[in-house]
């Protein structure tokens, strides 16, 4: 068996009493004692997550902009200034999702960009970058030397700035989906995966443990993968491998907004397949499900509607709502507000809701 990879924060996790598990070949915390307390810290105060398993790749070259316009379904031409971020799907030729990622523009000349992509898809993402990059002559620099920490919650920025007061002007000026280079390989962006305000900090691996411990002292709760999953589920955010994959179109996974077809002259990987699917008609759509009574919704449960069957793609007990929730794909022409889920052979009633369930600590439905 191959040894699990560790992040630059590994010692800090051990010192904080983390229960470590195998996540896509990485040894990462599932929790530090109480997943529920960690979830609640992010919804009401401040929590932090080690996301160093995600891959930071710096891309440079005279044709870098043209490369990205080919590589991803969203259009980097929208990145109007340095530091602006774009969320996109990375598609295969069949229009399936290889990964979802964020691209930052990192210089004025539009010749340098930074990609942040998922840890579990690292190899196939990199293969796709190189495959598409060949004709554009761009250089890739995977930043294995860096760590990444998400600091999230209504008090996240306030507590972060007690540790890094010199960042105040920069951080206060960041709007959502903007990042800033702080020098010496420190980078901060107003992004996250929780449905709360906060930032993600990319930093030298050598400084990771000290930064983590300083934030702990400032009252930021270390949080594991368990809370990360319940938070992103409440926020209605997709998890790669559950809610979309190589065989799922972004149009079937609530990601249609990330596909930019405005510039008809732009050809991107997977475009022909997406247009063909649009022409034919997308058969399914993504919705949220809420279980009003006991039990837990899980992935791959059958959803029964008056327009046919669907399936849950992720399911969890929501600590904020105190009820079980799921993300599901159902027939496109189903527009009811109730359905049934097959749970241990029984049909159970669920409410059908528009995602997200929770945003900025507030429930998003009546």
Curated annotation (Swiss-Prot):
InterPro entries: GCS_T (IPR006223), GCS_T_bac (IPR022903), GCST_C (IPR013977), GCV_T_N (IPR006222), GcvT/YgfZ/DmdA (IPR028896), GcvT/YgfZ_C (IPR029043), TrmE/GcvT_dom1 (IPR027266). Its EC number is 2.1.2.10. It catalyses: N(6)-[(R)-S(8)-aminomethyldihydrolipoyl]-L-lysyl-[protein] + (6S)-5,6,7,8-tetrahydrofolate = N(6)-[(R)-dihydrolipoyl]-L-lysyl-[protein] + (6R)-5,10-methylene-5,6,7,8-tetrahydrofolate + NH4(+). Pfam families: GCV_T, GCV_T_C. GO terms for biological process: glycine decarboxylation via glycine cleavage system. The keyword Metal-binding does not apply. One of its GO terms (molecular function) is transaminase activity. The keyword Chloroplast does not apply. Keywords: Aminotransferase, Transferase. HAMAP family: GcvT. The glycine cleavage system catalyzes the degradation of glycine. NCBIfam families: gcvT, PRK00389.1. The glycine cleavage system is composed of four proteins: P, T, L and H. Belongs to the GcvT family. PANTHER family: AMINOMETHYLTRANSFERASE, AMINOMETHYLTRANSFERASE, MITOCHONDRIAL. This is Aminomethyltransferase. The gene is gcvT.
């Amino acid at each position: 068996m191959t040894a699990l990879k560790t992040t630059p924060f590994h010692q800090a996790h051990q010192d904080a009493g983390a229960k470590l598990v195998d996540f896509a070949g990485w040894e990462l915390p599932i929790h530090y004692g109480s997943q529920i307390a960690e979830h609640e810290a992010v919804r009401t105060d401040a929590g932090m997550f080690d996301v160093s398993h995600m891959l930071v790749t710096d891309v440079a070259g005279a044709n870098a902009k043209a490369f990205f316009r080919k590589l991803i379904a969203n259009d980097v031409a929208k990145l109007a200034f340095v530091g602006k971020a774009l969320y996109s799907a990375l598609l295969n030729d069949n229009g399936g999702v290889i990964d979802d990622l964020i691209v930052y523009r990192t210089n004025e000349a539009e010749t340098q960009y930074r990609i942040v992509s998922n840890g579990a898809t690292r190899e196939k993402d990199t293969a796709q970058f190189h495959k598409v990059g060949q004709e554009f002559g761009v250089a890739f620099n995977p930043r294995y030397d860096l760590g990444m920490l998400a600091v999230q919650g209504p008090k996240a920025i306030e507590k972060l700035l007690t540790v890094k007061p010199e960042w105040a002007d920069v951080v206060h000026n960041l709007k959502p989906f903007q990042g800033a280079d702080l020098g010496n390989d420190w980078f901060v962006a107003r992004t996250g995966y929780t449905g709360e305000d906060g930032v993600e900090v990319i930093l030298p691996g050598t400084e990771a443990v000290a930064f983590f411990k300083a934030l702990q002292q400032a009252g930021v709760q270390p949080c594991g993968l368990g809370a990360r999953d319940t938070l992103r589920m409440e926020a209605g955010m997709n998890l790669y491998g559950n809610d979309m994959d190589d065989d799922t179109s972004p149009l079937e996974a609530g990601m249609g907004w990330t596909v930019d077809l405005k510039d008809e002259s732009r050809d991107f990987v997977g475009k022909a397949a997406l247009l063909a699917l649009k022409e034919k008609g997308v058969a399914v759509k993504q919705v949220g499900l809420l279980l009003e009574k006991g039990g837990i919704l899980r992935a791959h449960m059958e959803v029964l509607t008056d327009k046919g069957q669907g399936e849950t793609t992720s399911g969890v007990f929501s600590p904020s709502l105190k009820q079980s929730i799921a993300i599901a794909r159902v027939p496109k022409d189903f527009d009811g507000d109730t359905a049934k889920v097959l749970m241990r052979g029984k049909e159970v009633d669920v409410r059908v809701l528009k995602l997200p369930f929770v945003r900025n600590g507030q429930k998003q439905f009546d």
